[in-house]
Amino acid sequence: MGRSELELKTILITGASRGIGAEVATQLADRERHVIVNYREKTRRANDIVKAIRDSGGNASDARADLCDEGATAVMFDDIARLFGRLDVLVLNASGGLERGADPGYAMRINCDAQERLVRLALPLMPPGGRIVFVTSHQAHFLGRRPVPADYVPVAASKRAGEDALRAMGPILEANGISLVVVSGDMIDGTITVRLLEQRDPDAVAARRAVAPLPTVSEFARAIVRGIQEPVQDGQTIYVGGPDYLD
């Protein structure tokens, strides 16, 4: 690896082999950045995203790691340290809990415990001016203030717990010169989350569509990219869709 590559801005996006994470990765394609596409098991999809970024003139690589596996995530960050020497941006996009057959504790492990662990692993690699972007949903962000579809409650509660855990790390992040941005969206059209909810509770999805058109994957990804690139106030939340949540 040449010295010029070591000087690129390095961005790790979790859950980036498909959906929102993949779209964020492709929107970030640039000669001045190196995008690391994290994925759990969809190797071909991750490779396709990396190839698309490279074909457009950007720089990218993949990093396979189950975020609930402490050993695998530690190895992933060791590899980032060895290959790039630092991590400028951590995008916490991966989440779960609606999958068929998921055990009752999985949502909390992936949406809260893993998120906090990733930040603690990333901190030693992040220079002052680095940024952490936490991706969530309005149903989680506004938990307790707005109704939540019954099937989504465990996910919403775990994602809210994850956001709270990261915000509680504010003094540590500030001491290291790291900013935290939260990007919250209504149900995002075309995502696996909405497809699973439509199977379990179609009325809940229809109710959200009745309020306003659901944001698309591309629209939501653009908001995440803004959260990465633009000057923002530390701890700021960027909202996408769901105008009734903001009344």
Sequence positions of predicted segments:
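Hydrophobic positions on the long internal alpha-helix
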Residues: 76, 91, 118-122, 126, ...
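Conserved glycine-rich Rossmann-like NAD(P)H-binding loop of the short-chain dehydrogenase/reductase
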Residues: 31-48
